[in-house]
Structures are given as structure tokens and as C-alpha cells.
């Protein structure tokens, strides 16, 4: 983003701060989901694990829908919280609706990752993140932002594509893992 100038960088930081602020709630929900899923699996209660996953996904979807609507509906007042420079405010206000678009996907991807962590499924989610962010999102950002000249908005649309792909892939993995039999994990078989 720095290659596009100081206004682009400043507006990116404004939008990123707002997106990061709202992302903290889904991160907390993901952590809670991970713990509750792990406890349910440890107790041998797969239905409780499935309910925890559902509750986590519904919670983040509801919260991020509210933030998405806010980012889309009032981007200028939100940008003004961080800057009084009109060029920065205008540029950030152009990025916030894109952040609004990916808010729901961002919540879903982090909650899905938390649910999968609760059943000790970390390798596949890591690979899915690699595919979505690095092999799809980053090239799309570079293509749109630099090659096609869309600038910061293009970079953010690429980020949105990457987040969307990761969310879909992780939701697929959650469905795959939680619709079948969930086995209790044996961490140390030497304990009695």
C-alpha cells in the first residue's frame, strides 16, 4: 500500500484499524468456541460440540452483519474519528464499504478456525489459509491494485476475495468434520 502514496497508506490504516477493532469480538468468540468444542469432545458429547459450533457461527455472523451495515452506511463519520484530513477521510470512506463486505466472511473464517482448533484440526486450516490468502487473495490484490490500476480499493477487493475464499473453505472443513462422527481425542494414552 505504501507504493501508492501517503494518503493511500493513511486511509488504509484508518480502515484497517476499524476492521481490526470489530474483528476482536469474533476472535473472542472463536477462542470460546474452541474451548467449548474441545470440552464437549473430551466429555464424549458430539452434539454439544456441534451446538457450540453453531452458536459461535451464528454469534459472529450476527455481530459482523451489524458492523458490515455500519461500515457501508456511515463510512465518512467513521473515518473522521481517525483523521480530519479530507483526502484521507474520503479515501478511507471508499475502503470501508469493502471492509463491510468482508466483515461477515472474516467472522466466519475465524469462528470456523476456532471450532476446528477445538477438535485439534489445525494443519488443514493452515493449508486452507495459505491457499485463500497467499495463493488467491494476494495475487488478486496485486492484480487489481497495481496491474489494473484500481489502487487501494483494488487491494482491498483482493483482500475481500481472499477472506471470502478462506471462509468458504473453512466452513466446508467444519461441515466435513462436524457432520461425521466426532471421536474423543486421546492426547496421552499412558494416563489412567
Predicted features by range, described:
Residues 1-21, 39, 77-86, 147:
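Helix-terminus/linker motif at the lipid-water interface of multi-pass membrane proteins
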Residues 11-75, 107-125:
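Small-residue-rich hydrophobic transmembrane alpha-helices
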Residues 27-30, 99-118, 124-134, 140, ...:
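Short runs within selected transmembrane alpha-helices of multi-pass transporters and secretion channels
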